[in-house]
Amino acid sequence: MIRFSPSMQVGLLCSACLWVVPAEASAQTADPAAAAPPAAAPVAGKRVFTAADFARFAPRTAYDMLVQVPGFTIRSADQERGLGQASENVLINGQRIANKSGGAIDQLKRIPANNVERIEIVDAASLGIAGLAGQVANVVIKSGQKASGNFEYRPHFRAHYAKPSLIAGSLSYTGKTGPLDYTLSVKNEPGRGAFGGPIWIYDGDGVLTETRNEVYHSEYEQANMQAKLGYDGPGSSIGNLTLGYTPYWNPVSQKDRRLLVTGEERSRDIQTTLDGYYADINADYEFALGPGRLKLIGVRHWEHEPLVQDLIFRFDTTGAADTGTRFSRDTRIGETILRSEYGWKVGRNDLQVTLERAFNSLDQIGELFELNPEGEFVEVEFPEGTGKVTEVRYEGMTTWSRPLSPKLDLQVAAGAEISHLDRVDDDQEVRKFFRPKGSINLAWRPSPGWDLSLKLRRRVGQISFYDFLAQPKLSEDRENAGNPDLVPPQSWEAETEFARDLGRWGKTRLKLHYYRVEDIIDVIPIGEDGQGIGNLPRADRFGFESVSTFQLEPLGWTGAKLDLTVGREWTAVDDPLTGEKRPISGIRNKWAGIQVRHDIPGTQWAWSAYADYNHYTRYFYLTEVNRNLDLPFFAGLYVENKNVFGTTVRVAVDNIIESKHKVWRTVYEGYRDRTPVAFFQKQNQLVGPIFTLSIKGTF
């Protein structure tokens, strides 16, 4: 019998209560902050939102509008090799943005809000686009858009350990000259990670043997420069070209001082540098051909990822010579995609045939060094860290979409992929895979305010080329052997979604899923006592997620809304050592979030507060089991003014409840099913509050 924790029971009860609220019409007021909350106008199976529905939020970009759609959750595109079937649940002008430069979501962040005609929420089955399921947002852009630009300055600071991020933000300009429209943009999306505090080490009997004080900080800077060109014509043809270049810098520092119960002091210093870049060219051209339209897509991606990591261990009180290791990895990644999509209509039937060829490569030179008594790094043999992996993949799909009735839509997609996977520098033959794939998608609108969908899918996953080569984990003193015998996972998947439009009360949605995964990726034994990434025979995943937006105006709180999310997933896989059932490693299995926003009537002020909870299963390696809960409980708030000299200014404080970085490790002397525990490790470290200033505007 499945038992729900009290928090899960409360979340499900709140969601269930929303399902029984009757849908009601909403009223309009003159004050944008006091205006009725976004309530879609039903149009032939669609929920339609216009600019007036978002006036109270004073959005600056199309993305700012989309995130305020009640009960809708944005899903980004899967970052897999090739383009394949659609996974991003956002369209622009009814078209999937099939590229490797951020997709539709990234483009919406560059489109001014006043260029948006409307946002439509539709059922995936009613579209002729394979891969989508549930609710999909179609953002319709005005044809006569004016030249304009957006800017945002978004510095953020942490109270402890991390360096401030002062150069953060974006600048974009969109214009049109004749048949050519263009968007030029530059942005920096930095990241910061930092924590510090005590670590306790216990022996196998639970006796404290060592205490450590650690400080970790990571600074990531990513300067993206992009030019997007669109050409209208001749006739009904449409072309797009996107050029992007992104250098990035990611230094990481991890230092600790160690005090043994014997009184001896030691220290460890790990320094990592990763200064690389990636570049993209994305082009597509669509034109009328015969009874339908043909779209040709080309993608070229390059990435250079040079990583150097130094670990030095010092014996501070004994005077013994330092020990250490250096791991360097110079990796070059490439991807070339050619794709064609031909769609046509026969009566009430929409048909589409797609063909795709993708070539991917990873070329890595790995080097390993040991620190000698003179303090110099001396190279040691490390042939397993160098190699080249390539894959040529062909995919063909046919998609048929048809309305079976005014309330029922059907979509069927069927096809297969052929993959040639090769570790170029070894003597093994090229491995060839043939994988059938496809989906059946049903969308049903039994009555006004209800949307139900069901999707059955055969999915082919992908594998990381890095796992073919050895990738040592210096910070955890754990080897990770390469595995040339990896195969892509496959899965049978069932998803169903129930959506209820509550009128002026908001929107609620419940999604259920079950996945039967074959050849799942996990850590397996390699050689006599090694470990690395490999395949296990099968695994099961099933769970639910409830997403609701509850408008509080009917309760008398004008301008306020409540967003509520609750999710749970159960997983099972056979452990490769013990054969016993256990959860899949590192899966988020419990999550919940609540956020309230209040746009104060009669003013330009708004405020919001939120709280999130995320819980993950343990990581199961062959020589250790650990659990890493980084900020499991997280809360924050912000205050916003929507007109400060024509800009929107927001001040936010996150992690106001001082959530910690928590780690529990159980490390064994060898394989965990046959050797005793070597030590236990416990961490409960400070992260501290995070402060963010955002200034957004248009010009």
Where are these regions (language model features)?
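Extracytoplasmic beta-strand/coil segments of soluble accessory domains associated
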Residues: P38, K46, Y63-K100, A124, ...
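Face-selective signature of the C-terminal outer-membrane beta-barrel domain
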Residues: Q226-Y248, T272-E429, F433-R435, A443-R445, ...
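Outer-membrane beta-barrel signature, preferentially recognizing the C-terminal barrel domain
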Residues: I270-Y278, T331, V389, R431, ...
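C-terminal beta-signal and adjacent terminal beta-strands/loops
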Residues: Q28, H615, N641-F699
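Short acidic/polar hinge/loop motifs at secondary-structure boundaries
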Residues: R96-D123, L171
